[in-house]
UniProtKB/Swiss-Prot annotation:
Protein name: DNA-directed RNA polymerase subunit beta
Top-rank taxon, per record: Bacteria
InterPro entries, per the entry: DNA-dir_RNA_pol_bsu_ext_1_sf, DNA-dir_RNA_pol_bsu_external_1, DNA-dir_RNA_pol_su2, DNA-dir_RNAP_su2_dom, DNA-dir_RNAP_su2_hyb_sf, RNA_pol_bsu_bac, RNA_pol_bsu_CS, RNA_pol_bsu_protrusion
GO cellular component terms given for this protein: DNA-directed RNA polymerase complex
Pfam families: RNA_pol_Rpb2_1, RNA_pol_Rpb2_2, RNA_pol_Rpb2_3, RNA_pol_Rpb2_45, RNA_pol_Rpb2_6, RNA_pol_Rpb2_7
Its EC number(s): 2.7.7.6
Keyword annotations from UniProtKB, A to Z: DNA-directed RNA polymerase, Nucleotidyltransferase, Transcription, Transferase
Record gene name: rpoB
Subunit annotation: The RNAP catalytic core consists of 2 alpha, 1 beta, 1 beta' and 1 omega subunit. When a sigma factor is associated with the core the holoenzyme is formed, which can initiate transcription.
Reaction(s) catalysed by this chain's protein: RNA(n) + a ribonucleoside 5'-triphosphate = RNA(n+1) + diphosphate
Keyword Iron: no
């Protein structure tokens, strides 16, 4: 893989993969971005917007007419205005990043002719109406809601359409399979059709009481005869003198058990003796021999069913109704009437069952009216039905596009399942659809066809942001519609404008509710770039309209064959959500119908082409797909005679000519996180699951370091997550500092656009998880970059590659029991050199409110606080930036007015002497909470409109304005430099026809000539070339616009700064303080590798006590070898060996670099690199300086990539170890640091990539002496967040009881918990120095007494001494 990028030349990864990647991996957050773009369609395409997304919502709700039909409100188009605040401002001010939506509406008023009722247009008014703010997506696929970044997770739900299923024999005791069909619309009523144990078919609407399915068919307008004709064939039995002649059909008579002999009606021969069963084969042979008809006796007709009403044509008397069973009595009547031909239903009880006929005879409804009334009673119990209302209700259930929508997906699925051909614009049900569903269900009961698998990905679809938002907005608009209709009827329609009819609140509220409190709108996991990307690619089966944890069974959670290449089989949470929350596979994408697709290479006549086709799970079932690692020759033909393929959920060997497709890449079946685990194929799946989940919890470290052993996915994740910054166009680095990079573009130059790109870097921002987001530039002034090159690293990235942890030297050996049960032993070097140190930024805020007793005040003047405690505060009472603070320090001084309480004489005296402000305020300052200590890095002060700003707020504002002005001036200077240099290039060497004052006509314009004039006069030069002059004019126009734009942007930002802030009601002022906390690794912190090998740091050992190698290198970490065999994650051992080889090769390269620096001979370096990398394209193109830089970068270790399922083999690892001059076993002699003696056996030593996880002991450890109590029970609260106590639970009580520690137990249950009086007495006793106290009644006992009283049981406490126990004599 040639990595010709800017960063790719600074550090080259040796690639072990053998399979070339044919398909480009789609952008990893495409799922989110594409979906929302399609919903918003911000830029209207020419020819108007297509009917999807927001446009479709408006089209479906509008036009709205009033009740009388005299006026109509039509939708014309919509557009977005630019957002009021940009992303950063929204983050800082706690606003939502949203754009106002303007909708053009047209109000049409009609004149209605009273006699003819004809309408004529009287008046048309058009107006733009504001319809609320619609949140916009940021560049990285997230939303900023109230200042926090959120992600809308995509939802997996059951696809609309029709599903056939059975109860697996669970309902009825006999274990009989009861079949059921369900028609699920996108919105509207569900229709269930099901069998019961007696084989009668019922229908349910919306899971209500069941009705016979024939009632539903009556309601659809069929009568009994038509129903039977729909489901059964008609057989004509003809009278012959020996009995009846019946046409013979092999399919119908298969499995027929004979009672009498079967006789050929034409020849009179016996074709099958009595008591035998006619097999399928025998029936077919009889047909082939030419058997046309059978002879049946009169008895054999009994038990059959009449197919149509038999009526006396003269009198109209009905002898038999359709579906009636032939009995002796009926047979006599028919014989008397002399029927020669009897039409019978083709029901043989073997191939065709009498279910519909039995349902019809069991149905008490006989007409359409009865059936409609019955359905109405089920749907609206208690309301008396009328024919009109019943008909209207039934019509609106399934046939009204307003109430019922199958959606295009539902219609496509239904057509496929029932083999219909309705267009996908037909979104409601039709009579044919319902009948086809019933027919298919009955066929299933007769043993024809298969039931559906609801966990097949062809039956589950994904609803992404756009679609979820569309549904929400539709709900909002429908609420609005009712209000609009009412308002249209109540106002004078001739004088109003559309604006007066519309209240946009419901629509805006629906959107706000969705983003704020929907289960699918989640607080983004921002621990590191990988966790962001994974969160955006998540698929959840939970949420509104989805499953619930409790009801989801095993099948839904299980891995299904159709997940291959679509959903990762590995990455899912452990615990109650397992299998319900999944992750999209690396190459998967969602198609327009919401089904997940995966790419395959097309195979033509046994040859694999490079054509890539995306297939959904339904389409894939028809084809045979080969694995990505099948051996191919140079021409793309399969080298083996049999190729293992997947077909219809099975794995089958095929000959090469039968193969249709082949996987594009071995990593297409796993998700991003799993694809980052090297040697994933050597890990047990459970551990791989933990590995991929724990990488998401890795905290960004102070110094990121890319892994020696990677998989080649690291760069992709860093780029797509937006953590690392990529160049938008190629160019040259013009200017650079820690906060921004300026690139002068050299490609895609457009005279109407600026020739300069400015990239702002984020400096020490707080993420959602309080980790630190900091970007730093990788380029120098004068560097040449191409489009897409990484120019700045972000958190957890190193030279444009994801770097979640550090490479550390690991020895697998026990060490004094300190690595028992997965504990981890660390060397002091790790702490001293800040290897696993991370920075966390905590945010604290305080609000000054306007209370009933007066306003709260932020001030330095706080009662009863020493000057020492105020040393970090400025005169406004706010802490300085850069101050070091620890738990309990004041960050912001605040006082709150106290309620008036009766004053003691002393207080009155003080009041009289010192005036008002003696004691009427209390200290409510913001203090640093326990367990936090760090440095103040930022302070923000927010003031309400019209409140005077304090000194600190003004200082911050001035600083901010200065920064903005500097930015503007810098941009202006860059723009000037850029434009004038381009202008000089254009004019240089041209013949001038005019110029500024003093310029001679027809002189050649040169740089020297230009330099005589100030730059602003250069525009006056004119050359004879018209095309050139047009370009210069365009450039000047663009220059003037840019200049104006810069100034305007500056003024806007300053105006926003000075305007004052929108604060919650009642808040006058708000201060936010950010504290940076440096967390070194310490015992109790959790660490993990990438293979699910997690542990807790148990001890930090002085470096001299750690085991060391022969060259004196000490191990950094000692892990327990027993953690490997039972866990079956051997990948970590392979990684250790390969990492060891990487480090060894790094040492080799370091030696050649030193040789180059001392002797200026580059040859050894080139040769070493060639030995390691072979014929790598990138290395061949480097010059000596670049080679030297590469050598420096590789001297710690040579990075390699071993892709999942296609990585380094054992032989490759051995070869690398030999290249590095190491022992091929990967083991080394290790010496004990404490004694200096070698250990008895060789030890596996090598480099593992270790992560520090976001479970830090500092965040968990907690202690309380006194603190808050619960109001009702008066017991201490629980949990660290509430500063609670430790629960002394049931088992702890048992322990004290077992020891007989009665007084300790009493103390625990009373004075240390909820005996309120006792608590205060203990305090008083301690103050007096007394050590006796008495326990009282615990408050929780009083609560119990009160509860009993509330149940009507009066419980009284008698506080009296008991008399002596009665003696036995008195008792007698």
């Amino acid at each position: 893989m040639a990595q010709q990028t800017f960063t790719g030349r600074k550090r080259v990864r040796k690639f072990f993969g053998h399979i070339k990647e044919v398909a480009e991996m789609p952008n990893l957050i495409e799922v989110q971005k594409a979906s929302y773009d399609q919903f918003l369609m911000v830029d209207e395409p020419t020819g108007g917007r297509p009917d999807e997304g927001l446009q479709a919502v408006f089209r479906s709700v509008f036009p709205i007419s009033d009740f009388s039909g005299t006026s109509m409100l039509e939708f014309v188009r919509y557009e977005f205005e630019p957002p009021k605040y940009d992303v950063d401002e929204c983050r800082q001010r706690g606003m939502t990043f949203a754009a106002p939506l303007k909708v053009t509406l047209r109000l049409i008023v009609f004149d209605i002719d009273e006699e003819t009722g004809a309408k004529s247009v009287k008046d048309i008014k058009e107006q733009d109406v504001y319809m609320g703010d619609i949140p916009l997506m940021t560049m990285n696929g997230t939303f900023i809601v109230n200042g926090t970044e959120r992600v809308i997770v995509s939802q997996m739900h059951r696809s609309p359409g029709v599903f056939f299923d059975h109860d697996k024999g669970k309902t009825h005791s006999s274990g009989k399979l009861l079949f059921a069909a369900r028609v699920i619309p996108y919105r509207g009523s569900w229709l269930d059709i099901e069998f019961d144990a007696k084989d009668i078919v019922f229908a349910r609407i919306d899971r209500r009481r069941k009705l016979p399915v024939t009632s539903l068919m009556f309601a659809l307008g069929l009568d009994g005869e038509q129903i039977l004709a729909t489901f059964y064939k008609k057989l004509i039995y003809k009278r012959i003198k020996e009995g009846w002649r019946v046409p013979f059909d092999a399919n119908r008579f298969r499995g027929y058990s004979t009672v009498n002999d079967l006789i050929d009606a034409d020849t009179g021969k016996v074709v099958l003796e009595a008591g035998k069963k006619l097999t399928v084969r025998a029936a077919r042979q009889l047909q082939e021999k030419g058997l046309k008809a059978l002879r049946m006796s009169d008895e054999e007709l009994l038990g059959n069913y009449i197919a149509e009403d038999l009526v006396n044509p003269k009198t109209g008397e009905i002898y038999a109704e359709a579906g009636e069973e032939i009995t002796d009595k009926l047979f006599k009547v028919l014989n008397e009437q002399g029927y020669k031909d009897l039409p019978l239903l083709d029901i043989d009880h073997v191939n065709v069952g009498p279910y519909i006929r039995n349902t019809l005879s069991a149905d008490k409804n006989m007409t359409r009216e009865d059936a409609l009334f019955d359905i109405y009673r089920v749907m609206r119990p208690g309301e008396p039905p009328t024919l009109d209302s019943a008909q209207a209700m039934f019509q609106s259930l399934f046939f009204d596009a307003e109430r019922y929508d199958l959606s295009a997906v539902g219609r496509v699925k239904m057509n496929m399942r029932l083999e219909l051909d309705a267009p996908d614009t037909q979104r409601t049900l039709r009579k044919e659809d319902i009948l086809a569903v019933i027919k298919t269900l009955v066929d299933l009961r007769d043993g024809k066809g298969e039931i559906d698998d609801i966990d097949h990905l062809g039956n589950r679809r994904v609803r992404s942001v756009g679609e979820l938002m569309e549904n929400q907005y539709r709900i909002g608009l429908l609420r609005m519609e009712r209000a609009i209709k009412e308002r249209m009827s109540s106002v004078d329609i001739d004088t109003v404008m559309p604006q007066d009819l519309i209240n946009a609140k419901p629509a805006a509220a629906a959107v706000r509710e969705f983003f704020g409190s929907s289960q699918l709108s989640q607080f983004m996991d921002q621990t590191n770039p990988l966790s962001e990307i994974t969160h955006k690619r998540r698929l959840s089966a939970l949420g509104p309209g989805g499953l619930t944890r409790e009801r989801a069974g095993f099948e839904v959670r299980d891995v299904h064959p159709t997940h291959y290449g679509r959903i990762c089989p590995i990455e899912t949470p452990e615990g109650p959500n397992i299998g319900l929350i999944n992750s999209l596979a690396t190459f998967a994408r969602v198609n327009k119908y919401g089904f997940v697709e995966t790419p395959y290479r097309k195979v033509k006549d046994g040859r694999v082409t490079d054509e890539v086709v995306y297939l959904s799970a339904m389409e894939e079932g028809r084809y045979r797909v080969a694995q990505a690692n099948v051996p191919l020759d140079a021409k793309g033909r399969f080298t083996e005679d049999l190729v293992v393929c997947r077909h219809a959920g099975e794995v089958v060997p095929m000959t090469p000519d039968k193969v249709d497709y082949m996987d594009v890449s071995p990593k297409q079946l796993v998700s991003v996180a799993a694809a980052l685990i090297p040697f994933l194929e050597n890990d047990d799946a459970n551990r791989a699951l933990m590995g991929s989940n724990m990488q998401r919890q890795a905290v960004p470290l102070v110094r990121a370091e890319a892994p020696f052993v990677g998989t080649g996915m690291e760069g992709v994740v860093a780029r797509d997550s937006g953590a690392a910054i990529a160049a938008r166009r190629s160019g040259v680095i013009d200017q650079i500092d820690a906060t921004r990079v300026v690139i002068r573009a050299t490609e895609d130059l457009d005279p109407t656009k600026s020739g300069v790109d400015i990239y702002r870097l984020m400096k020490f921002q707080r993420s959602n998880q309080s980790t630190c987001i900091n970007q730093r530039p990788l380029v120098k002034v004068g560097d040449i970059v191409k489009k897409g090159d990484i120019i700045a690293d972000g958190p957890s990235t190193d030279l444009g590659e994801l770097a979640l942890g550090r490479n550390v030297l690991v020895a697998f050996m026990p060490w004094n029991g300190y690595n028992f049960e997965d504990s981890i032993l660390l060397s002091e070097r790790i702490v001293k050199e800040d290897v696993f140190t991370s920075i966390h930024i905590e945010e604290f805020e305080v609000m000054a409110r306007d209370t009933k007793l007066g306003p709260e005040e932020i001030t330095r003047d706080i009662p009863n606080v020493s000057e020492e405690a105020l040393k970090n505060l400025d005169e406004a009472g706010i802490v300085y930036i850069g101050a070091e603070v620890r738990a309990g320090d004041i960050l912001v001084g605040k006082i709150t007015p106290k309620g008036e309480s009766p004053m003691t004489p002393e207080e009155k005296l003080l009041r009289a002497i010192f005036g008002e402000k003696a004691s009427d305020v209390r200290d409510t300052s913001l203090r640093v909470p326990p367990g936090v200590q760090g440095t103040i890095v930022e302070v923000r002060v927010f003031n309400r409109h019209g409140v005077d700003k304090d000194e600190r707020a003004l200082a911050i504002e001035r600083e901010e304005i200065e920064r903005l002005a500097k930015d503007r001036d810098d941009e202006q200077a860059i723009l000037d430099r850029n434009v004038y240099s381009r202008l000089a290039d254009m004019l240089d060497g041209r013949q001038g026809i005019s110029g500024p004052k003093g310029f001679k006509k027809d002189t050649k314009i040169t740089r020297a000539v230009l330099d005589e004039y100030p730059k602003s006069q250069w525009w006056l030069f004119a050359a004879s070339n018209d095309k050139l002059m047009a370009e210069i004019e365009a450039m000047r126009k663009q220059y003037d616009e840019s200049k104006k734009g810069l100034e305007q942007r500056f003024l806007d930002k300053v105006e926003k700064l000075q305007r004052g802030d929108e604060l919650p009601p009642g808040v006058m002022k708000m201060v936010k303080v950010f504290v940076a906390v440096k967390r070194k690794i310490q015992p109790g912190d959790k660490m993990a590798g990438r293979h699910g090998n997690k542990g807790v740091v148990s001890k930090i050992v002085p470096i001299e006590d750690m085991p060391f190698l022969e060259d004196g290198t000490h191990a950094d970490i000692v892990l327990n070898p027993l953690g490997v065999p039972s866990r079956m994650n051997v990948g970590q051992i392979l990684e250790t060996h390969l990492g060891w080889a990487c480090a060894g090769l790094g040492k080799r390269i370091a030696q050649t670099v030193d040789a180059y620096l001392s002797k200026q001979d580059v040859k050894p370096l080139k040769e070493t690199l060639k030995r390691i990398y072979g014929e790598d394209e990138t290395i061949k193109t480097l010059n000596d300086n670049e080679l030297l830089e590469l050598g420096h970068n590789l001297s710690r270790g040579v990075p390699i990539a071993t892709p999942v399922f296609d990585g380094a083999k054992e032989s490759d690892i051995e070869e690398m170890l030999k290249l590095a001059g190491m022992d091929a076993s990967g083991q080394s002699t290790v010496y004990d640091g404490r004694t200096g003696d070698p250990f008895d056996r060789k030890v596996t030593v090598g480099y593992i990539y270790m992560l520090k996880l976001h479970h830090l002991v500092d965040d968990k450890i907690h202690a309380r002496s006194i603190g808050p109590y619960s109001l009702v029970t008066q017991q201490p609260l629980g949990g660290k967040a509430q500063f609670g106590g430790q629960r002394f639970g049931e088992m702890e009580v048992w322990a004290l009881e077992a020891y007989g520690a009665a007084y300790t137990l009493q103390e625990m249950l009373t004075v240390k918990s909820d005996d309120v009086a006792g608590r205060t007495k203990v305090y008083e006793a301690i103050v007096r120095g007394d050590d006796t106290f008495e326990a009282g009644i615990p408050e929780s006992f009083n609560v119990l007494v009160k509860e009993m009283r509330s149940l009507g049981l009066n419980v009284d406490l008698h506080n009296s001494k008991l008399g002596p126990a009665p003696t036995s004599e008195a008792a007698e």
